[in-house]
Amino acid sequence: MTSAELHTTAIRINTHQYDDLHKFKQYRLFPNASVQYNFIKGVNFAVNYNKKISLPSISLLNPNNNTYGNGNFGISGNANLQPTIFDNIEAKISAFDYVFLGYNLSLVNNQIIQKMIRRGDEVSVINENISSVKIHNFNIGFPIPFMIFTKSIKEIMGSMSTINPDKVSFLYFFANYQLQRLSEIKPNGLWFLNLNAQIVLPKGIKLNANYSYIPAKVGYFYFQTDEPLNNTLDITLSRKFMSDRLNVSLYVNDVFNTNKMSSRSVYQTPNVLIRDKSDTRTFGISVNYKIPTRNKLAKENPNMLGSDKKEDEGGLIK
């Protein structure tokens, strides 16, 4: 399966710092090619190549947009940022949309990254393009259905293609390891770990628990974490009513109030240390109602794996 896209992009930026309009124009072909081999029904190996463009956000471009500032610290935009071009190569083996093992290589031109600069007692965060970056991603995901305690492996494998994950109790494990290679520095690899549990209780009640964790001493471009990052446990109790059209949920986000940021900038020596902690524990109730439709093709996708990969803009500080 192959496809190609032709994009033309023109952006004009007008600020009080420039007498003339600063503009850039891109006219490129963005191909997309995929090859898939099916071993058996539901099990396949796929290779994909695609070229993408990512435009800098307005907040990054606008030099007047000071997201935060005081006498000692400030963040501002950069009107000279250029669009980022990604050449992505991915290989992945997957089974029944739930189990997968994958590798992705991104060759990036004009990656937007954050640099923290210290001049005396004044610290500023700037956004710049760097000419080239290689980003390696290794990821794995698999479920552990609780039915393994009551059914044989043969029975479970035979029902994988027809199983509805909304009706099954399971523990899902996901891990991603990212390695960034820049010309100036070689950051430590970045681990992202996630556990998601779903337990189907009596009376149609579901308990969902989601735990995510990024360990300390991992690298993210010109930053290194000193303490675990994104360390959160979220719990949700939900039940559907009215033929599944009405969904009522009670939730607690960051149950132990452990989410915080503690990192250092390695762009300059001595390093600038950053630490931020606020009360991130939240409680709430959510009520959702799905309006009935006569479109017989409209239905929820039971696939628990996200398929869209978003390109980030290289910064810990937003």
Model-derived features with residue positions:
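Surface-exposed extracellular loop regions of Gram-negative outer-membrane beta-barrel proteins
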Residues: 1-21, 26-36, 193-217
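Transmembrane beta-strands of outer-membrane beta-barrel pores
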Residues: 4-12, 49-55, 97, 105-111, ...
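Residues on the lipid-exposed face of transmembrane beta-strands in outer-membrane beta-barrel proteins
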Residues: 6, 33-37, 89-95, 103, ...
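Outer-membrane beta-barrel strand-turn architecture
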Residues: 29, 37-41, 53, 85, ...
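Outer-membrane beta-barrel signature, preferentially recognizing the C-terminal barrel domain
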Residues: 53-109, 125-146, 278-279
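Outer membrane beta-barrel strand-and-loop segments of large Gram-negative receptors
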Residues: 82, 102-173, 183-184, 192
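Conserved C-terminal beta-signal and adjacent last beta-strands/turns
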Residues: 187-318
